[in-house]
Amino acid sequence: FFYDTEFIAEGSTIELVSIGIVAEDGREFYAVSTEFNASNANEWVRENVLSKLPRASHPAWKPLQQIRDEAHAFLTAGRGKPELWAWVGAYDHVVFAQLWGDMAGLPKDLPRYTRELKQYWQMAGRPRLPKVPDGNHDALVDARHNLRKFRVCMEALPLDASGAASR
């Protein structure tokens, strides 16, 4: 699964704004939290993230508990244990895991880490990536772009089912 989050990090907390998750089979999940405090957002987040969110009446707006439950169901609907990939995903994984409280609350059927797509791209020899799409910094747009970047990297440096380079 390829994902992205948008969040507000004001120095002592990280608040989820939105999350987009894309499966290799084309399924998608998108949600916007009803619980973030927009007044904590810096100018960059207001201009580049909050301005792109759907209207508050859109069904993507959900409480964190609903986002947590729906994201878990989405990620575990298929066969096997899910694998998460993100581009510079350290904060993404923290804000994702915080949906369950602390790291100990993360369900056992979800990964304890996110695979780093930017590092994979570097190891694959920095192949030419797809153009950054219009609407970037929308979590779902960025998650879709992460899948496209992964496919480019797989052509340059294929991985086997265990995640090892297969050349």
Language model regions located:
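Intrinsically disordered, low-complexity terminal extensions
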Residues: 35-37, 44-45, 70-76, 98, ...
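Acidic, Mg2+-coordinating catalytic module of metal-dependent nucleases/exonucleases
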Residues: 83-89, 95, 128-167
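Conserved non-catalytic scaffold segment of RNase H-like nuclease domains
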Residues: 1-87, 133
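Hydrophobic positions within alpha-helical membrane elements
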Residues: 9-11, 121, 147
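Substrate-recognition/cap helix-loop segment adjacent to the acidic, metal-dependent catalytic center
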Residues: 90-111
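Amphipathic alpha-helical interface surfaces
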Residues: 63, 67-74, 92-99, 116
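Short, flexible loop segments at boundaries between secondary-structure elements
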Residues: 108-128
